[in-house]
């Protein structure tokens, strides 16, 4: 995964539809929830109140029967020109499990949305004695396969 460095990132405020995420890798050798190339759920990310290298974010999952949501508790963005990497910390509810996650989204901003998007998710804390969601400290990598995460008007 490319981390776009720099202290002059583009303004990424807006709503983006991540609707073509494909699984690439997991750090957990026992994680069999996905195999390479499997599609992931669709997400809508909302970035707002960007001030320099700080930005706020929320997300929700758009999948029938799944009501995952998260509220950002802090985000830092790096990059320069149109390329950026945003480091997000969320309080989330995933498949009914309260948890905290850290997400990295890296890509290039265009007038249509975000191209070359890579999405990394790790859970840092969870209330999940049944291990319904991924293990704490492991991570999964997804790519927005052969398309742009389109900018949206409604969250």
Where on the chain are the PLM-derived regions?
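Amphipathic/hydrophobic helical signal segments and adjacent flexible N-terminal regions
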Residues: 1-34, 146-155
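Generic short beta-strand segments
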Residues: 15-26, 58-62, 85-93, 102, ...
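Short coil-to-beta strand junction motifs in C2/discoidin
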Residues: 36-42
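Contiguous, well-ordered beta-strand patches that form the walls/edges
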Residues: 45-112
């Amino acid at each position: 995964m490319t981390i776009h460095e720099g202290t002059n990132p583009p303004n990424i405020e807006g709503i983006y539809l991540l609707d073509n995420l494909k699984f690439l890798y997991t750090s957990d050798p026992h994680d069999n929830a996905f195999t390479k190339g499997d599609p992931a759920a669709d997400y809508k990310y909302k970035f707002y109140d960007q001030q320099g290298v700080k930005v706020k974010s929320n997300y929700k999952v758009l999948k029938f029967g799944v009501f995952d949501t998260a509220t950002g508790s802090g985000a830092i963005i790096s990059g320069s020109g149109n390329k950026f990497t945003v480091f997000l910390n969320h309080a989330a509810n995933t498949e009914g499990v309260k948890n905290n996650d850290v997400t990295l989204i890296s890509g290039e901003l265009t007038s249509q949305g975000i191209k070359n998007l890579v999405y990394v998710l790790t859970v840092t804390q969870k209330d999940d004695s049944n291990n319904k969601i991924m293990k704490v400290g492991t991570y999964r990598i997804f790519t927005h396969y052969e398309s742009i995460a389109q900018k949206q008007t409604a969250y």
